[in-house]
A protein has these predicted regions:
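Histidine-centered, transition-metal-coordinating active-site segments
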Residues: 1-81, 91-418
Length: 418
């Protein structure tokens, strides 16, 4: 009898084949839930095609990881570990992907990677008792046990902490890895921007392992430059598009000011479930859900880049990274201008960006040139330019309900920096 397998037709990579362990994992509720979580959160409000899901990205990352381990001629055990980590690396994402992660981090000091690890070890469930009774499917941790998979090694690869063999985790978590490659190409395709044209085949051909680390052959410098440029442009043009950011801030604020919110509970939800739940949480939360449904977003009332501010004001902005102080300043502006709670939102994005995606300005890529190992900086100025480029353009932004925009525009700066 032929081996049981499934072929999934992917918009980016074509046919993706899953069998054995990977087919079993695909059928778990943790993976299937990702069908209902958009890869780019609320970006579809600006880029109407951006309705692709975390599941598509997880499959794409698995596919590229499988290609990479084959090209590198890793042994069967290593291939299985890397491919498994690639398929599972995003199962801990909550609704709207990264949009709400700062709330989870602020309330519980955990992120989606921590939740991914909990799911892998069976310490956290994403379904309730009724759902569990209906679906009756093995969970990720049960499938891993059935196949005698080393869960600790899987989580080390996902976290980038395989210290004995760094190249294993570097395939999934480094300055350039298959996770980033898939989401850059996929997100560019679905948003319609022209920044994700990356020669994947060429990139894979230039991968090599040297001194137990993943490196790039000299002939791959050009494609690495292309990837770094695509990453920078995607962050400024898509991931931190101002209007997308405003929508994300509104959703986060609706949950942030909900009394007695249980972040673990809402992180189990899908996108649609969360929006429906918002409508039951109170008048403000219902309003935000309705505004997001009909794209009636708050407006920018104040904006500044780092070059617009002197040292004293930069210090004020830096202090706003403290969440308690941040909320107090929002309330101060609302009280001074007689604005209802929740309708003034201050965005200080730098810290949040680097917590959500610490690789954003990583360029520590080593190049193998004949018998020498050199830094990417030795071959191109692009690496330095990426590190020095600010993403997004603003260091601080204040958004508000359009009814209060003029008042906030006129007076917020004085209140903020007084």
């Amino acid at each position: 009898m032929a081996d049981k397998h499934k072929i999934i037709r992917d918009s980016i990579h074509g046919d993706i084949k899953l069998e054995g362990l990977f087919l079993d994992l695909l059928e778990t509720p943790e993976i299937q839930r990702l069908y209902n979580i958009k890869q780019l959160g609320l970006a579809h409000l600006v880029f109407p095609g951006a309705h692709h899901t975390r599941l598509e990205h997880s499959l794409g990352t698995y596919h590229m990881a499988s290609q990479a381990v084959e090209q590198l001629n890793l042994d069967n055990h290593e291939r299985q570990m890397v491919s498994c980590a690639a398929l599972l690396h995003d199962i801990g994402h909550g609704p709207f992907s990264h949009t709400l992660e700062s709330i989870l981090r602020n309330l519980l000091d955990v992120d989606h990677v921590d939740l991914t690890e909990k799911l892998i070890f069976g310490k956290y469930e994403i379904f309730d008792a009724i759902e569990k009774e209906i679906i009756k499917s093995p969970s990720v941790d049960e499938i891993l046990d059935n196949h005698s998979i080393d869960k600790k090694k899987i989580t080390e690869i996902i976290r980038g902490k395989t210290h004995d063999k760094p190249y294993l985790s570097q395939l999934l978590n480094s300055a350039i890895d298959v996770d980033q490659l898939d989401y850059l190409i996929r997100d560019a395709y679905y948003t319609g921007v022209a920044y994700g044209m990356i020669d994947v085949e060429r990139f894979l051909q230039t991968l090599t392992i040297n001194e137990n680390n993943l490196m790039i052959k000299r002939k791959g410098v050009g494609v690495v430059e292309n990837i770094l440029m695509a990453r920078g442009l995607m962050y400024s043009s898509v991931y931190f598009h101002k209007t997308v950011r405003i929508a994300e801030l509104m959703l986060s604020k609706a949950l942030e000011i909900t009394p007695d919110v249980d972040p673990f509970q809402f992180f189990k939800m899908t996108d649609a479930e969360l929006i429906n739940e918002l409508k039951t949480m109170g008048p403000f939360q219902h309003e935000i859900a309705t505004r997001l449904k009909y794209r009636k977003l708050f407006k920018q009332a104040y904006w500044a880049s780092s070059s617009n501010l002197d040292e004293a004001r930069l210090t004020v902005v830096k202090n706003l990274e403290n969440k308690k102080h941040h909320r107090e300043k929002e309330r101060e502006i609302e009280n001074a201008l007689n604005i209802p709670a929740g309708r003034v939102i201050i965005d200080v994005p730098y810290q949040e960006i680097h917590q959500a995606e610490p690789r954003i300005d990583q360029t520590d890529i080593m190049i193998v040139d004949k018998e020498e190992i050199k830094s990417l900086d030795d071959y191109t100025p692009i690496a330095g330019a990426i590190r020095s480029r600010a993403v997004p353009d603003w260091i601080i932004m204040i958004v508000t309900d359009e009814r209060f925009r003029d008042d906030v525009s006129k007076k917020a700066e004085k209140i903020l920096f007084s």
